[in-house]
């Protein structure tokens, strides 16, 4: 303020008598008041502090600029005192019933008043002032009807800066002001065009749209206020010039005043303008249509915004997934058993590069190569091996063990998958198919009632054909196409609608879709559209014959081991790898609270589907064993192998009615397993429980590499566990001590007390590697003394009464 040499007239706060609130300016509220000492009605704008507005007003003096009287400088009371415009703001006048009296002369007079006031600010004031917030609310009507420009709170001296902050109200703001770009005085020209549009249409600019929406429409879509088609041409041209996107093309206020004067001399313009003003009902629909279009555009924008947010969310998830994948080392090839030392070197490099302590682990890749670690050796490495190689950090050892375990798990899961790219030079794979005949019977149950309106019906689908055909049906879907009925999908028989449907509509049909399992090569599904008609007699069923071409699973692998997906795999190495994984899973699951799998009796079968499945797996020759332990290789050609295995695994082994005997119903089956147990169970127990020699255990003449490596890693049973689970027939006199040796189960260690007896049994191994076992039948007295309840408890596969 001192730079301009302005001296303010200071008015005491007590010298003012305040009345009602007249509205608000840019940075304060305006009140009507009486300047007591001067006996003058004034307007007082209360402020938190005196800023640039008083500085600007103090140097301005024009008929169309609000007159400045002085300031209030009594803390905390600060304010600006100006003349009072008794007729209110131009905005209030336009949006009231008084605006209906406006005519061509009225509009021209007021348009000229505003233009002259703005021309004074730009060209004739002591310092050029850019208002930047010109709008109908900041134009007031004095008592004599003259328009005066007020509220300079957003104004700037042009020689101070031309880069303005975001101020003003969006519908009146020029695009460069909205974007906070450097501005010139023509930004006020844009606002003047909006004020002139308000006087012509007596409408609120961009009514119903939010400020930011208007800003987006003006800047991004280059939208402007609608100029009605019946608007006089001279006014329309002036508005278009004021709203040019390029600020340099807009006219100055000197040019606008000249245009208004020429329009006043046009004798035809008054009639055109008055006709336009009085026929507002005809052209108002054009403005409303534009507003509706802009609102729809805004709604589409909101929808696109939500869509973009959803896409951004999905991209973030995808980015996170890629980040997680990037932390997984790249594999030289999926056939880990064929990895060379260089392949292992590459894998370790990828692994240590992803770790946090990559600098400390950078030399480990060379360490693996120096120790000649190939793919087969890599998957069998243990903690002691890593220490022997020179990896002493416990954290680094855990890091490598976790990576190797994950690599082993992934390899075993993918072992039986066929290659994506087949070798053209190799032998063609056997592709066996079998044909299953199936007849699908479609019909519906009908309760006739009195007619089609109150009858009840429901659709069904039956099957006839080969017994195994039902195992190839994945699901059956009934679609009635009724508005209040849902699509019914069933995965197991009986395939019939659960609820009755009341009434039969005209041309009522039901679309039945039968989907087959993945091992059905053709067809993948069968569709049938069944017509529902009302008839008191039994409706005729429709039969559709289907031939299913079944792709036989693992048939070529069982008949020809060389045709497996990985024929070059080392069976002994894979068996060792599988046994190691089973042992690691066993140690992890011993701490779980499952009463059966967590008990000391089942350390070996903790990761098996059922006891029977584990026994069958133990009896299967090595050449037919699959790596995945949850599939029974002896039934690999059966299409229902997974379903049966899953059903067996769901049995509760601890329940009374679902013991091991429930897994085999026929006596011949139990006898067959009894014969096998005599020949194989003792042999397996001896080889699995032989004491280890050295770190990896000693190799016996008849033991497999996998069993000799893990021979010393099974848990011994405590005496309390044996005493708890013994059958009552074991509680005999001390003379029967030699008959209290419990029946061994494959994979279970011998009791410490019976270890010496096991050694004796091992010493009696015959030439073929089988163990001689003498069985003694109970006397008639012992058998008769056994209760029926005890007989039931002891009658299950896996336990033998001595």
Curated annotation (Swiss-Prot):
Region annotated C-terminal domain (CTD), chain positions: 776-802
GO molecular function: ATP binding; JUN kinase kinase kinase activity; magnesium ion binding; MAP kinase kinase kinase activity; protein kinase activator activity; protein serine kinase activity; protein serine/threonine kinase activity; ribosome binding
Amino acid composition bias (Basic and acidic residues), ranges on this chain: 667-678, 728-741
A GO term from the CC aspect: nucleus
Cofactor(s) needed by this chain: Mg(2+)
Record: active site: 133 (proton acceptor)
Modified residues (Phosphoserine): 2-3, 7, 165, 275, 302, 567, 587, 593, 599, 634, 638, 649-650, 661, 685, 720, 727, 733
Binding, ATP: 22-30, 45
Residues modified to N-acetylserine: 2
Modified how: Activated by phosphorylation by PKN1, followed by autophosphorylation on Thr-161 and Ser-165. Autophosphorylation in response to ribotoxic stress promotes dissociation from colliding ribosomes and activation.
Effect of residue 368 to C: Causes a split-hand/split-foot phenotype in knockin mice. Gain-of-function mutant that cases a constitutive ribotoxic stress response (RSR)
Regulation: Activated in response to stress, such as ribosomal stress, osmotic shock and ionizing radiation. Activated by phosphorylation by PKN1, followed by autophosphorylation on Thr-161 and Ser-165.
Span list, region Sensing domain (S): 670-713
Catalytic activity: L-seryl-[protein] + ATP = O-phospho-L-seryl-[protein] + ADP + H(+); L-threonyl-[protein] + ATP = O-phospho-L-threonyl-[protein] + ADP + H(+)
Transmembrane segments: none
EC assignment: 2.7.11.25
Region annotation Disordered: where it falls in the sequence: 624-802
Compartments it resides in: Cytoplasm; Nucleus
Chief site of localization: cytoplasm
Top enzyme category: transferase
Subunit structure: Homodimer. Interacts with ZNF33A. Component of a signaling complex containing at least AKAP13, PKN1, MAPK14, MAP3K20 and MAP2K3. Within this complex, AKAP13 interacts directly with PKN1, which in turn recruits MAPK14, MAP2K3 and MAP3K20. Interacts with EIF2AK4/GCN2; promoting EIF2AK4/GCN2 kinase activity.
Name of the protein in question: Mitogen-activated protein kinase kinase kinase 20
Organism from which the protein derives: Mus musculus
Gene (UniProt): Map3k20
């Amino acid at each position: 303020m001192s730079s301009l040499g302005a001296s303010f007239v200071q008015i005491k706060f007590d010298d003012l008598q305040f009345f009602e609130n007249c509205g608000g300016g840019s940075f304060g509220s305006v009140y009507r008041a009486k300047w007591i000492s001067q006996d003058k009605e004034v307007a007082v704008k209360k402020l938190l502090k005196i800023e640039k507005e008083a500085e600007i007003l103090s140097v301005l003096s024009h008929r169309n600029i609000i007159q400045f009287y002085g300031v209030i400088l009594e803390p905390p009371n600060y304010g600006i005192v100006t003349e009072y415009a008794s007729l209110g703001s131009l905005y209030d006048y336009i949006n009231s019933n008084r605006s209906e009296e406006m005519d061509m002369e009225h509009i021209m007079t007021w348009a000229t008043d505003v233009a002259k006031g703005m021309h004074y600010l730009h060209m004739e004031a002591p310092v050029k002032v850019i208002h930047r917030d010109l709008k109908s609310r900041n134009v007031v009507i004095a008592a004599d009807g003259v328009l005066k420009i007020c509220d300079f709170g957003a104004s700037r001296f042009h020689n101070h800066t031309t880069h303005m902050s975001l101020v003003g109200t969006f519908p009146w703001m020029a695009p460069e002001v909205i974007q906070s770009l450097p501005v010139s005085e023509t930004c006020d020209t844009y606002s003047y065009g909006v004020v002139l549009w308000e006087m012509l249409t007596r409408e609120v600019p961009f009514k119903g749209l939010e400020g930011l929406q208007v800003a987006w429409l003006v800047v991004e879509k280059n939208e402007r206020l609608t100029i009605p088609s019946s608007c006089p041409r001279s006014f329309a041209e002036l508005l278009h010039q004021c709203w040019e996107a390029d600020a340099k093309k807009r006219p100055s206020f000197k040019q606008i005043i000249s245009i208004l004067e020429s329009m006043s001399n046009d004798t035809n313009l008054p009639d055109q303008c008055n006709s336009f003003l009085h026929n507002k009902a005809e052209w108002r629909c054009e403005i409303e249509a534009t507003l509706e279009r802009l609102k729809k555009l805004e709604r589409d924008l909101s929808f696109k915004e939500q869509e973009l947010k959803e896409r951004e969310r999905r991209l973030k998830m995808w980015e996170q997934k890629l980040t997680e994948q990037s932390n997984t080392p790249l594999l030289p090839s999926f056939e880990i058993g064929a990895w060379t030392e260089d392949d292992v070197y590459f894998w370790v490099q990828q692994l240590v590069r992803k770790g946090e302590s990559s600098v400390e682990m950078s030399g480990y890749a060379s360490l693996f190569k120096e120790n000649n670690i190939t793919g087969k050796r890599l998957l069998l490495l243990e903690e002691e091996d890593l220490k022997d190689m020179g990896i002493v950090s416990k954290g680094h050892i855990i890091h490598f063990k976790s990576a190797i375990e994950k690599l082993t798990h992934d390899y075993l899961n993918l072992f039986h998958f066929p290659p994506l790219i087949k070798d053209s030079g190799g032998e063609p794979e056997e592709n066996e198919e079998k044909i299953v005949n199936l007849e699908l019977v479609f019909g519906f149950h009908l309760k006739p009632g009195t007619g089609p309106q109150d009858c009840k019906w429901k659709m069904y689908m039956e099957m006839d054909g080969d017994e195994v055909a039902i195992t190839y049906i994945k699901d059956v879907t009934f679609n009635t196409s009724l508005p209040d009925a849902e699509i019914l999908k069933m995965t197991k028989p009986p395939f019939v609608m659960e609820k009755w449907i009341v009434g039969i509509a005209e041309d009522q049909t039901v679309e039945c879709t039968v989907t087959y399992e993945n091992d059905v090569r053709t067809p993948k599904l069968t569709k049938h559209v069944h017509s529902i008609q009302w008839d008191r007699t039994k409706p005729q069923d429709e039969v559709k014959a289907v031939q299913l071409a079944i792709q036989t699973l693992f048939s070529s692998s069982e008949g020809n081991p060389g045709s497996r997906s990985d024929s070059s795999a080392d069976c002994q190495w894979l068996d060792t790898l599988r046994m190691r994984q089973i042992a690691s899973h066993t140690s992890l699951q011993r701490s779980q609270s499952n009463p059966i799998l967590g008990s000391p009796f089942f350390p070996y079968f903790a990761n098996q589907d059922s006891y029977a499945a584990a026994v069958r797996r133990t009896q299967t020759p090595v050449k037919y064993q699959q790596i995945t332990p949850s599939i029974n290789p002896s039934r690999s050609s059966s299409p229902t192998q997974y379903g049966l295995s899953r059903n067996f695994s769901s049995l509760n082994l601890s329940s009374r009615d679902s013991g091991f005997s429930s897994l085999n119903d026929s006596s011949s089956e139990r006898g067959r397993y009894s014969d096998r147990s005599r020949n194989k169970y003792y042999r397996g127990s001896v080889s699995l429980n032989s004491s280890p020699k050295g770190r990896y255990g000693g190799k016996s003449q008849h033991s497999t590499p996998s069993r000799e490596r893990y021979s010393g890693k099974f848990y011994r049973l405590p005496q309390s566990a044996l005493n708890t689970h013994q059958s009552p027939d074991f509680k005999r006199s001390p003379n029967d001590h030699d008959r209290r040796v419990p029946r061994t189960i494959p994979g279970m260690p011998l009791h410490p007390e019976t270890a010496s007896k096991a050694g004796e049994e091992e010493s009696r191994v015959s030439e073929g590697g089988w163990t001689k076992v003498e069985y003694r039948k109970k006397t008639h007295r012992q058998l008769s003394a056994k209760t029926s309840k005890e007989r039931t408890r002891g009658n299950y596969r896996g336990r033998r009464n001595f």
